[in-house]
Amino acid sequence: MGVNSSKINDKDRSILSIKEQRDKLLRYSKRLEKIEQLEIDIARKCLRDSDKRGALRALKAKKLYSGLITQTYGQLGNIEQLLSTIEFTLIQKDVMFGLQEGTNLIRQLQADMPLERVGRICNDRDEAMSYVDEVNDMLQGRMSRDQEDEIQEELDSLIREQEDEKVKDLEKPGFTPSTGVDVLPSVPLKNAIPSLDESFPKAASVSNTSSAVVIDEELRKDPVLG
């Protein structure tokens, strides 16, 4: 009975160790996904600031995280499968192999980016930008031509996305693009110039009066009519 109890305890400890590694990998993958999204946000901001090189560097770092995330979830799938199909006779072989694989992956992830660094990157933009530079240096010569092309395609996609947003802004109701020309308001004239119709009768009246005076004087001078 003591032997059976010892075997059961060994089995339980092995399964518990696998579950602990599964949980660690799951937490790590979630943090990597946050940083992956952060790199995309950094790339978008760089494009808004017309910094195409900075955007490209951020997308290269994002590519690295995407690979780590894929690798992590692959190992998580293996561990889940191992936990669901584990049997007592396979403990010494399969469980120890799973433990070793999980341990190796965790060591690799922690060597690339310690957990403490992950927390700082998530909370500090300056730290994130600094890490982007480090990753960019680390990636020199490690990416294939296909990976470089994929990164360039993603950069072009972000550029098109921002251009589409600008077009949508122009199409919004009530949007008036600036012309750079100031339009002066109309000002009513206080002392308007009188029209010809208003001034003409007065001039005619003066002219008629002057003519009557001249005719009367001529009549007085004429001895026949006077």
UniProtKB/Swiss-Prot annotation:
Disulfide pattern: none
Keywords on record: Cytoplasm, Endosome, Lipoprotein, Membrane, Myristate, Phosphoprotein, Protein transport, Transport, Vacuole
Task of the protein: Class E VPS protein implicated in concentration and sorting of cargo proteins of the multivesicular body (MVB) for incorporation into intralumenal vesicles. The lumenal sequestrated membrane proteins will be targeted into the vacuole after fusion of the endosome with the vacuole.
Family the entry assigns: Belongs to the SNF7 family.
Subcellular location as annotated: Endosome membrane; Vacuole membrane; Cytoplasm, Cell cortex
Principal subcellular localisation of the protein: membrane
A biological-process GO annotation: protein transport to vacuole involved in ubiquitin-dependent protein catabolic process via the multivesicular body sorting pathway
Cellular component terms (Gene Ontology): cell cortex; ESCRT III complex; multivesicular body; nuclear envelope; vacuolar membrane
N-myristoyl glycine lipid sites: G2
Name used for this protein in its record: Vacuolar protein sorting-associated protein 20
Assembly description: Component of the endosomal sorting required for transport complex III (ESCRT-III).
Superkingdom of origin organism: Eukaryota
Species this protein is from: Schizosaccharomyces pombe (strain 972 / ATCC 24843) (Fission yeast)
Database matches in Gene3D superfamilies: ESAT-6-like
Membrane topology summary: Peripheral membrane protein
